[in-house]
A protein has these predicted regions:
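Conserved alpha/beta-domain cores
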Residues: 3-225, 229-231, 243
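Gly/Pro- and small hydrophobic-enriched strand-loop and loop-to-helix capping segments
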Residues: 233-247
Length: 247
């Protein structure tokens, strides 16, 4: 009987999902703040995109309750579903995963930023659709800094070649660059990949046509965002850390 009572007490004292998410968010924000300070940066210069691909719309909405209203999705279909849910009112959505051209029209009206423009053909499709819908979407060019064959994105050389053409895509604001670190190699490799993107951005900015600013660097996820911040990330994309205890 005593054991049963103890078990009941343990169940009754478990934190509610709302509290779990709020506590996880606070820990992540503390780590972002500490990483920024260690790099001599203003923590306010780094935007957290909370990636909700692991959970349903109701659980994702717990982030909004905790005052985190910028959410990201990896798949357009999941973004569409969550954006339509009443619980998602007030969310600013980012698409952080791959976007196929046949999904551009439905996605553009829903998103604040697309992180994953990985080809000139996709950029052209976004530009054409934006003109038809009277939109001016912000996008990032995805660059493959790790050299991994299974990753999407421009090579550094292709990004250089595209730079001069960017003003012709007059309905799209190319706001910066995005990359993902190599899966293997640990922290040192993540630093190297992120440093490569920062240096490429600096190079592109130095020769960019008028009106092309490339201010944003989206780099760093749950396992390597501190390396991203150390190397100059302005946006970090964090998912699983925010839902520890619920997955």
């Amino acid at each position: 009987m005593t054991g049963v009572k103890l078990a009941l007490v343990a169940v009754n004292t478990m934190p509610e999902p709302r509290q779990i998410v709020a506590d996880n968010l606070a820990r992540v924000q503390d780590r972002i703040h500490a990483a920024a300070q260690a790099a001599g940066r203003d923590p306010a210069s780094i935007q957290l995109v909370a990636v909700s691909k692991y959970v349903d719309a109701a659980t994702a909405a717990l982030l909004v309750d905790a005052a985190c209203t910028t959410l990201g999705e990896s798949r357009p279909q999941q973004l569409w579903e969550k954006a339509a849910a009443p619980a998602s009112a007030g969310v600013r959505w980012h698409l952080v995963g791959r976007l196929q051209r046949n999904k551009v029209r439905r996605t553009l009206p829903l998103v604040e930023l697309i992180h994953s423009v990985d080809s000139e053909r996709l950029l052209a499709a976004i530009d054409e659709t934006a003109a038809a819908l009277s939109l001016a979407p912000r996008v990032l060019l995805e660059v493959n800094c790790s050299g991994e064959a299974d990753k999407q994105g421009f090579s550094a050389e292709d990004a250089r070649h595209l730079l001069a053409k960017l003003p012709t895509f007059s309905n799209v604001r190319v706001a910066g660059l995005m990359t993902m670190a190599a899966l293997e190699g640990g922290e040192a490799t993540a630093h190297a990949n992120f440093a490569a993107l920062r240096k490429l951005r600096e190079e592109l900015v130095s020769m960019a046509p008028p009106g092309v600013e490339l201010k944003e660097l989206s780099m760093g996820m749950s396992g390597d965002f501190e390396a991203g911040i150390a190397e100059g990330a302005t946006i970090v994309r964090i998912g699983s850390l925010l839902f520890n205890g619920l997955l």
